[in-house]
Amino acid sequence: MQGRQSRNHFGLHMPNLQFRLAACYGGSNMAKTAPKTTPQIVLDKKTLKKALAELAAADPDIARALDEAGHPELRDMPTGFGGLMRSIVGQQVSVHAARSIWLRLEAAVPSMEPADFLAMSDEQLRAVGLSGAKMKYGRSLATDIVEGRISFDSLHELDDAAAIAMLTQAKGIGPWTAEIYLMFAHGRPDIMPGLDLGLVVAAQHLKKLRTRPDAKRLLKIAEAWRPWRSAAALVLWHYRRNMPDWGAPRSSAKTEKKAT
């Protein structure tokens, strides 16, 4: 995975999960020392509408993106082991391949419960299309959940940084994967995946920057979008997909295609 960028099964750009994380997030201990809080707002259809209105009022560039490319829609992702395992399946493969593997895995483990996944043999998991590394990541994640190191019940009590710290204990779950999971599976409203290439490219064009911003600069730009950075990320992804030539939008730009 080193030095590579790829799209995952959501059509988002998954970065190298080991890419200078300390520089981007202010050090490896930041999330571990974050206080516990309970997020009060969930990004749903109603709050997304409110978020987009507030973002457009506060940032003319966001208003322009919404006018030119249309409004984004929310994306769905399973919660729990299934959601994180789906992210692992989607790492470093095409959208089509990830979907095929995931459907076979769902058929083999209908409950998508950690204990049932652990009961599968390597041969069975290999037969559905999982690589050796992804089997290892899946087993590690399932074990962490079964043994209580990752608790989805307590996840709701943690602020974003602490939740990311908990999830990234598992092998194969880096900050980007954890952030995407919290955004789409739990509706966390104020997350900006600073390592996402799609967001970087969109922000460069939206803000008319001469060069692509690094993660640190993107996060600095995104400070102006609090407390709706997740909604701003949806705007940027949608803007990039519907303005491929950064000229006239596609004829279907006003209708967001549901992520797969």
Residue locations for each model-derived region?
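Basic polycationic patches enriched in arginine
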Residues: 4-7, 20
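Short, Lys/Arg-enriched N-terminal segments with co-localized hydrophobic residues
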Residues: 11-13, 17-29
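Alpha-helical scaffold segments that form or flank carboxylate-/histidine-based iron centers
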Residues: 77-92
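C-terminal accessory module of base-excision DNA glycosylases/AP lyases that mediates lesion recognition
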Residues: 23-72, 175-260
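Short acidic alpha-helix initiation/capping motifs at coil-to-helix transition points
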Residues: 42-43, 78-81, 115-117, 156-159, ...
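Alpha-helical ds-nucleic-acid-binding substructure associated with the helix-hairpin-helix region
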Residues: 42, 61, 65, 93-94, ...
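Alpha-helical scaffolds flanking conserved acidic
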Residues: 49, 79-83, 119, 163-164
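Short, amphipathic alpha-helical segments that act as regulatory/interfacial helices
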Residues: 85, 102, 139-142, 233-236, ...
